[in-house]
Each structure stands twice: as C-alpha cells, then as structure tokens.
C-alpha cells in the first residue's frame, strides 16, 4: 500500500485526565496551532584499536562502534490563550472537551503526571489509527501577549518512562 500523508489539521496532542495512559478520559490540548513529538536515543560509543594484516597495531587509529543507550521523548504545542475559560477543569459539570491554557497551567503548577497521546484526532474518537502514548509532566509553559495580536502559549510535556506505539 502506498504511503498517504496525514493532514496536520487532523493530528493533535491529547491528555488523559486520570494521570495514566489508559485512554479513558482524553481531552485535546485546546486551541493549538501546532504540535510536535520528539524522540531521542542517547548513543554510546566504543573505540577499538585496529590490527594490521600482519598482526601489528595499526598506526592510523581504530574503529568507533555506536549503539542506542537510554531514550527520552517530549511533546510540545503552541496555541491561543483563552483566559475567560474558567470551566476547563477536570471533571467539572461544564468541563470542555479540551485542556485550555488555564488547565495546562494548573497541571504545571501542581506537577501533575498525565497520560499523553500524539495521534490523529479521529483516533481519539475510537478509530484505530497509529499514534504514540506515554506518561509525562509539563516541563514548561509560557504565555505571551503582543500589541494587536492574539495571546499565545507554548507548552512542553517531558516524557516519564517509555513511549509506546498505538497500533
């Protein structure tokens, strides 16, 4: 089957309210204008001395071998701020289906560990599309408001443990 590009409009970061990656209470990171997923492998290198064909030590150095060590991941989003939204709290009677800036800031201040998902928005509604999930904390959140511009925010989730594939 040929590869088909996914529209960036369909991909989002979703947060699981029950602080674990169970997928029971997914809410979109709200008013986002962009999002990204980053995965890193630390590399471990070993250097060995080379031997010439005659069994003597080579004078031109050796060989460097590398392998993957520890891994880490993070997710980030940029979005628009809605400071008037007081009811984007977890479990509130009028809670929205999104985590707005207020709620993200509350999670950052509390150091809340959350389940985090990077996937097609239709997958959060039950369609089986590939994505990625893990647990994370909000590492940083920043808001800015310029003259004659919309107030914006940037949030970064730092992974805690392994990142898993959603099949």
Q: What kind of region is each of these model predictions?
A:
Residues 1-6, 63-70, 97-113:
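Short, surface-exposed loop and linker segments with low hydrophobicity and enrichment for Pro/Ser/Thr
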Residues 81, 89-135:
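Short, acidic/charged, Gly/Pro-enriched secondary-structure junctions
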Residues 2-83, 131-151:
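Solvent-exposed edge beta-strands and adjacent loop segments
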Residues 118-120, 142, 161:
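Short leucine-rich amphipathic alpha-helical surface patches
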Residues 1, 10, 14-18, 109-121:
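Short, compositionally biased strand/turn segments
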Residues 151-166:
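Short solvent-exposed strand/turn elements
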